[in-house]
From Swiss-Prot:
It comes from Psychrobacter cryohalolentis (strain ATCC BAA-1226 / DSM 17306 / VKM B-2378 / K5). The keyword RNA-binding does not apply. Its main location: cytoplasm. The lineage of its organism: Bacteria, Pseudomonadati, Pseudomonadota, Gammaproteobacteria, Moraxellales. Gene3D superfamilies: 3.30.465.10, UDP-N-acetylenolpyruvoylglucosamine reductase, C-terminal domain, Uridine Diphospho-n-acetylenolpyruvylglucosamine Reductase, domain 2. Keywords: Cell cycle, Cell division, Cell shape, Cell wall biogenesis/degradation, Cytoplasm, FAD, Flavoprotein, NADP, Oxidoreductase, Peptidoglycan synthesis. This is UDP-N-acetylenolpyruvoylglucosamine reductase. It is an enzyme of class 1 (oxidoreductase). It comes from the Bacteria. Its EC number is 1.3.1.98.
């Protein structure tokens, strides 16, 4: 792999025609070759690279920001310079009897961060355990699981605005978070996140364990430790256990986690569906809306374990698409399976599923049409 460390201004030869293999840098294990990869281990390196990039008109190509590769669908050939933020570090910036503020660099593994904070007695992220990827990518999707979203604990994001070559500190409000959405997702390849600030609490009795099977499993962990009620560590271990049972390890069976978003429909539409399918799974949402479990829809459409070779839904969790031809399958294989699943679900339930992972075009731009190549 061609990997340029920007400890000094980038020399032209590091942006040559030597291709970089990204097949092993995306958890879906899709075959992908890129023009060049630049690995950034601190913010100064980014400033230096951008100064060179601005001057080097001969080799200039589009920029594409790639974090842990856990939520992207890459093209077979990526005609772009790939920027990989790999800054590391965690530090406490403020602390009281009730909360602790921490700043986390973009290259920190997300799950490792969750485990670390719980071990330190800093709580709020435990429901987000075992979500793949790096911390810098978490705000892009406003990651969420088991009743918690990233925005619940996020204070700020420090990010580089690539078009203007300026640094910005964005508050949670500035990030314009929504369900699996943010300003970073809506403005792709515009921002490079270098660090994220969180405010976590220190009250070990404050837990959210009422979602799905979490309460039962967390209570089991608490009982084993001689406690009457679950603590945050119990919730974290419960969620890890549940996710490991339901979700395949990308290292063993390539996938990019939940492939489809849970659709949100009007309550009256959900009530109509419920009259025909009493077991349908839904969760009340604001503004008279209901969030429907996409995995349930896919399974009831007869697609659990189904798809189009070599991309299939997982046998234990229909929400996950898996790649049975790692490093060979392409984005077009995923597109075919995705269309088949979306069309089948719509035909049965009249609900349109939406893809969660980011669709990357050949020039590094982000596409929203599954037929874009």
């Amino acid at each position: 792999m061609t990997s340029a460390l920007c400890s000094k201004p980038i020399a032209p030869h590091t942006l040559s025609d030597d291709l970089a293999d990204l097949s092993y840098s995306n958890t879906m294990a899709l075959a992908c070759m890129a023009d060049s990869v630049v690995t950034l281990t601190d913010e100064v390196q980014l400033d230096e690279f951008m100064a060179y990039y601005e001057q080097d008109t001969q080799h200039r190509k589009p920029l594409f920001v790639l974090s842990g590769g856990s939520n992207v669908l890459l093209p077979a050939k990526l005609n772009a310079i790939v920027l990989r933020p790999q800054m590391r570090g965690i530090q406490v910036t403020a602390q009281t009897d009730f909360h602790v503020d921490i700043e986390v660099m973009a290259g920190e593994n997300w799950h490792d961060l969750v485990v670390h904070t719980v071990a330190q007695g800093w709580y709020g992220l435990e429901n987000l355990a075992l979500i793949p990827g790096l911390t810098g990518a978490a705000p892009i999707q406003n990651i969420g699981a088991y009743g918690v979203q990233l925005e619940d604990c996020l204070q700020y994001v420090r990010a580089y605005h690539l078009p203007s070559q300026t640094w910005h500190d964005l508050t949670a409000v500035d990030c314009e978070f929504g369900y699996r959405d943010s300003i970073f997702k809506r403005q792709p390849n515009t921002w490079l996140i270098s660090r994220v600030g969180f405010r976590l609490h220190t009250d070990a009795t404050k837990v959210l364990a009422s979602y799905g099977d979490v309460q039962t499993v967390a209570q089991s962990y608490a009982t084993q430790q001689g406690r009457t009620k679950p603590m945050p560590a119990d919730v974290m271990h419960a969620i890890i256990e549940i996710r490991q049972q339901k979700l395949p390890d990308p290292k063993q069976l390539p996938n990019c986690g939940s492939f489809f978003q849970n659709p949100i429909v009007p309550q009256d539409q959900f009530a109509t569906l419920q009259s025909s399918y009493p077991a349908i799974v839904g969760y009340p949402m604001p503004d008279a809306m209901t969030k429907v479990a996409a995995g349930w829809l896919i399974e009831q459409a007869g697609l659990k374990g189904g798809g189009i070779e070599p991309i299939f839904t997982h046998q234990q969790q229909a929400l996950v698409l898996t790649n049975h031809a790692p490093y060979i399958a392409t984005k077009q294989d995923v597109a075919a399976a995705q269309k088949y699943i979306i069309d089948t679900v719509y035909k049965k339930f009249a609900i349109q599923l939406s893809r969660e992972p980011v669709w990357v075009n050949a020039d590094g731009s982000i596409g929203y049409d599954e037929h874009v190549v």
